[in-house]
Amino acid sequence: NCLVDNTAIIDYYDVMRSLRDVNNFKKIGEIPFVGGTTIHYTDEFVKTSDNFYQYRIYPVDTCGVRIAIPPVDDPEFINDTSFAQTILLETEININYSAVDPTLDEEYTNTLVFNEYDKWLGNVLEYRLYRSINREPFNLLPIRTWDRVTNPNEELNHIDVVTDFGEGNGRFCYYIEAIEGNSTPYGPVSEGSFSNISCISQIPIIFVPNTFTPNGDEHNEVFRPFTNFVSEEDYSFTIFSRSGGIIFSTND
């Protein structure tokens, strides 16, 4: 969305796009001017899980002349809304943090990194991180927030320790919500801006003992596999004899 001057003599608007940080804007579409104060464009040819994108909107007058927009940080055009940058959230499992935080050595972790949203006139008030576990619905409340007013230089990353979720199937999904501040003449964007949904799976861990002693001494009485992050879907456990016959089988 982009707010425009509905009194300007404009024929249409050029939509320009560049991939993350390469500053190579190319035209991807046009938006006809119909006299409203807001224009909309949907970019369907993107890979939001691989890249974040930058956009610029250029007005084109009735003579076909594209009107150059001002630099993004030009103080004379402080209320310009013709530039935008999306959020890319990336995740990675079990990074080696031994040199940074040895307490994480024995933990299962998901590391999340994302870039700044740009650019709202009211700037970003805060970022909110939401999580889904085991393909369940996302949390209604964020599991973490980043306050960009009181701590604007806080790094945009998060280490999610997921060791306690080992009984699940190991599937985790995340997304970021950006909230606009109130210092804007047009009012903050009520719906915010969202990143891609980034999903990741922890590596299944299975340990199967080779003996057990059901002799009543309360040690190793039960033979069963010990699992972490193993899905119950299509699970089966079968014990075979040396000759290949099935001794025991279960889906529990």
Locate each region found by the language model.
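Recognizes extended acidic, P/S/T-rich segments that occur
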Residues: D11-S49, E126-G168
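Short proline/glycine-enriched turn/loop motifs at strand-loop junctions of beta-rich domains
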Residues: A8-I10, G122-V124, V230-D234
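Conserved beta-strand and immediately adjacent loop positions that scaffold enzyme active sites
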Residues: Y12-D14, R56, A99, T111, ...
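Beta-strand-rich modules
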Residues: Y41-I67, D160-P188
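Solvent-exposed strand-loop boundary residues in beta-sheet-rich modules
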Residues: L19-N23, D61-C63, D118, I133-P137, ...
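Pro/Thr/Ser/Gly-rich low-complexity, intrinsically disordered linker/stalk tracts
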Residues: N1-A8, S49, C63-N123, S183-G216
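Short loop/turn motifs at secondary-structure boundaries
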Residues: Y97-S98, S195-D252
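Exposed, low-structure sequence patches enriched in small/polar residues
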Residues: Q54, Y130, I159, F172-E177, ...
